[in-house]
Amino acid sequence: TTGGGNTGGNTGGESTDKNNTNKNVATANMPQVVRNAIGGLEFPKLKNNGTSYAIVHMDNTTGMLNYSTEWDDNMKSQRWSCYTFHTGNTASNVDRWKPGQGERKYPWDTDLKEQWGITDFTEDPTPTAQGFDHGHICPSADRKFNLTQQKQTFFMTNMQPQYANFNQRGTWYKMEEDLRAKAPKIDSDTLFIVKGGTIDPVGSESNLLGWKKNGASSETQKPGYIPI
């Protein structure tokens, strides 16, 4: 449970900061759909560094919030994706989305343009030739309620480069499978999830594994490379 529950720590999952000084605060330039979402318990603290943008993916066929992402337009990388599991969205009603004729396998994020007016993300930076896969941070397998929600997980802004042995067949994959198995059985009403990778340099890039060369990626902080 949240608040006074028993989800860990001496305070039983309840913050001692009654004023919630770490809460996300809406800014004047935020679209209304973002303002409405950033107070959700699944949302981590937004970076607010001038180049990061919260993108909220709504399912307009149902009015449901599908998932949200923080996109760093300087790094040309997403920082995390967050979403919820509850009885209203865990049903597996559709198969894995497949692009139709003329569609990209990993579409550009239309909400990045509609919500923030950003149109310069027009490349696929994933260095697949160097052993990386397109890693869904909000997994497509977690969003099978309908095809709208399923397709949104394939947006490039939901991707980070991932090693298959760890992420698609190893520890990460097992964690996701375990979460999916437990989600329909949870006693409380909602499971709040946030996942991502570390892309923020600290000191001399000590939080980054490194940069992988990818000639197509010309607009990143380090041209020709992407952070991993």
Name every feature range the model reports, one short phrase each.
Residues 1-228:
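Domain-level detector for secreted/extracellular nuclease and nuclease-toxin modules, and
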